[in-house]
Regions:
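Hydrophobic h-region of N-terminal signal peptides that target proteins for export
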Residues: 19-29
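Intrinsic-disorder-associated, low-complexity terminal segments enriched in Asp/Asn/His/Tyr and depleted
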Residues: 3-4
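Sec-dependent signal peptide recognition
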Residues: 10-19
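A "functional boundary" signal
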Residues: 27-184
Length: 184
């Protein structure tokens, strides 16, 4: 009888702990969704995508996220969905063509929907950093100069900020510290 009561107590405690953790995680996700001003369903699914970021399944999950965001007329989450596909290829670092393709896909969508944050992030923090990490500093510099020219022509502060940051990184990698300092 005593053993039976202890196992019931342990089972009750386990249920309580599970429910507590479930509701705590749910409340946290809802708060984050509210903080980022995004639909809680989209945000929850985005988090699931992030959990699978290094697995090929994230590509189809990102397509689903894109469609869900499209149904809710959420252009920002559509950009995030395409960016997630780019992130998968960037972190795999095995297919340069895919990195270029998805960088351009993010840029095209971001340009069409006036979201420079995603436009310049994809270009600088994915494509140019990919080149930099693979020792291709001249191509990285070429892309950064193209990006700088465009950001200057459009007087885009987000783009200029990303350009200065990436130029500094490129010159640091090239061990041209005086040039790197100029871009900081």
């Amino acid at each position: 009888r005593k053993h039976h009561t202890m196992s019931q107590t342990a089972l009750s405690f386990t249920r309580f702990l599970f429910l507590f953790l479930f509701f705590t995680a749910s409340v946290k996700a809802q708060k984050e969704a509210k903080d980022f001003n995004v639909d809680s369903t989209l945000y929850a699914y985005y988090q699931r995508c992030q959990e699978c970021l290094l697995q090929p399944v994230v590509l189809s999950m990102s397509d689903t996220l894109y469609r869900m965001a499209e149904e809710r007329h959420d252009k920002r989450m559509q950009a995030v969905a395409i960016s997630t596909q780019l992130d998968y290829h960037y972190f795999q670092a095995t297919n340069e063509d895919s990195i270029i393709y998805y960088t351009n896909k993010v840029k095209d969508f971001a340009k069409a929907t006036q979201q420079p944050k995603y436009y310049y992030f994809a270009w600088s923090n994915r494509l140019i950093l990919y080149y930099l990490k693979n020792g291709r500093t001249n191509i990285a510099l070429y892309e950064a100069q193209k990006m700088l020219k465009e950001a200057q022509e459009e007087d885009d502060k987000t783009g200029l900020s990303r350009c200065y940051n990436i130029m500094s990184q490129i010159y640091t990698v090239k061990r041209l510290d005086s040039m790197a300092f100029e871009w900081q």
